[in-house]
Amino acid sequence: MKRIFSLLFMGFSLTVAAEQITMDLTTATDMVANPITYSTNYGIGFYDGTDVWDSTYNDSGVCQFIYTNEARFMLSHLPSQFSYGAQSWEGFTLSKVSQDTANVFGCVSNGGLAGVGTPYVIGYFSDWVTSSQGYSSNIILFDQEYYPDYVYICQNSNTMKAISEGGVYNARPFNENDTLALIISAIDETYTETTSLIYYLAVDGEKNNGWVKVALNTLGKTIGLSFRMTTTDVGQFGMNTPLYFALDGLTVNTNPVTNSLSPIPDSQSPIANTQKLLRNGQLFLLRDGVCYTMMGSIVNYEF
């Protein structure tokens, strides 16, 4: 009887030990536990870094990841020494920019989920880095395998200007046939993408204009997440649209989760009239029986 009681107690302990973990940016540090601090006067124009992590361009090796929640979440960050060219960065950084002025470090909500001027994550996807290293420039690793539950996504200020007005380098304004897609994938220990889903920051003439909750439960148990972006505005030298996005409130569970998607007041998620299909890692658009690549070319593809 004592042995049976012990086994029952152990089973109860395993049941109550289920845990939900939400990324807490107030706990953010570099790789040697230095707290994240924000610059007060830094940069100009689109690259104004005021209220941005002051080591965004730091070449030090301790800045290759941003840790939160005592290193339960690890966000990739490539400073200029490791990224494309000098004085640049890719991956993720942290921001508290609170003015929507086409700044690459801003978002259209002017702050994180906690309100105006509160911290949020800025992602900058580099197709060049991704192609060079064989996996995305934007990786969030976990300290163990979890079941992703949801994440909040918001349009970046610079990207919004580009797709709304053009005039940001070679970017042109979007029309109703354009799309800007964020591909979120579960990854294995080699950073290989295993399962994916797509959230559209712009589609069918609609644009993300605030924090939107994106369900991740279909990705299944994973050691981390990969983020990639694609756009239909492509030129001679690659994608023209600035590939930035904002992220907050990433939540994972130790146990499997069901769909936890719920509406958010004053936030609109673009609703597509076009069917989007992901096949063998490539995104296609199916409109009126015609199949298009993300570059706008018509292709013959059996679905």
Residue positions per predicted region:
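Sec-dependent N-terminal signal peptides
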Residues: 3-15
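Terminal, low-complexity interaction segments
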Residues: 23-29, 176-257
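Extended extracellular/luminal ectodomain segments enriched in beta-structured repeat modules
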Residues: 143-150, 221-222
